[in-house]
Every structure is written in C-alpha cells, then in structure tokens.
From Swiss-Prot:
It is found in: Plastid, Apicoplast. It comes from Eimeria tenella. InterPro entries: NA-bd_OB-fold, Ribosomal_uS12, Ribosomal_uS12_bac. Belongs to the universal ribosomal protein uS12 family. This is Small ribosomal subunit protein uS12c. One of its GO terms (biological process) is translation. GO terms for molecular function: rRNA binding; structural constituent of ribosome; tRNA binding. Part of the 30S ribosomal subunit. The gene is rps12.
C-alpha cells in the first residue's frame, strides 16, 4: 500500500483498455454467417455495400463487410474475419477474409490478389 506522499510523487499508471474487445487481441476469428444483406454508405457516396451478420466463436455477434466484387457467401457458412473499418459504412469495424474457410476468392482478379484470395 502506498502512502499519500508516494502517490503524489508517482501517481498510479492506468492500464490502457484495448478498443477491440470482440476479437480479444486475436488477429482473426472464425464465425458462422447468420444473415447476408446490403447497406448504403454515408453522405457523398452512393452504393449498396454487401455486409454479413456473423456469430463468432466467442458467441458475440458482429456485422462484417464483404470486400471485392461479387460474393458466394450464404447463411450458415463459416467465415474468417479480421479487424479494419470500412470508411463510408458507420459502425462496421470488421472485414471478411476472402479465400479462407467457406468464402471463395474474387474471380478474374489480376492486381492485389492476396487481399482478395485469388490464386494465380
């Protein structure tokens, strides 16, 4: 136990809380797709972004973005998610990893293939 003078001299250091409690300091997490739907982005942009609701292996539910053109993900498929927000979709802080588990890669992709799970 510290005395009052010791506390004044060196105050207690706060532990930094990590923001991403859902991933729990893991780089990726596996989950089951519950629902696939579209969302519209923030003000200057206009599109229908494909998103999916996922129940993770720690029983928490999140909404993740499906990157790339076209997708072949359905309900009850397994998917691997990573952190990383989508700039024009508020509240979506996770992305699906294409080419892992039941999610197929982007077809006919020539550049940035590793990001979209496309083989050469």
């Amino acid at each position: 136990m510290l005395t009052f003078n010791q506390l004044i001299k060196n105050s207690r250091k706060k532990k930094n809380k990590f923001k991403n409690s859902i991933l729990n300091r893991c780089p990726q997490k596996k989950g089951i797709c519950l629902k696939v739907f579209t969302k519209s982005p923030k003000k200057p942009n206009s599109a229908l972004r494909k998103v999916v609701k996922i129940r993770l292996s720690n029983n928490k539910e999140i909404i993740a973005y499906i990157p790339g053109e076209g997708y072949a993900i359905q309900e009850h498929n397994y998917a691997l998610i990573k952190g990383g927000k989508v700039q024009d979709l508020p509240g979506i802080r996770y992305k699906i990893i294409r080419g892992a588990l039941n999610v197929s890669g982007v077809k006919n992709r020539k550049s940035s293939r590793s990001k979209y799970g496309t083989k050469k």
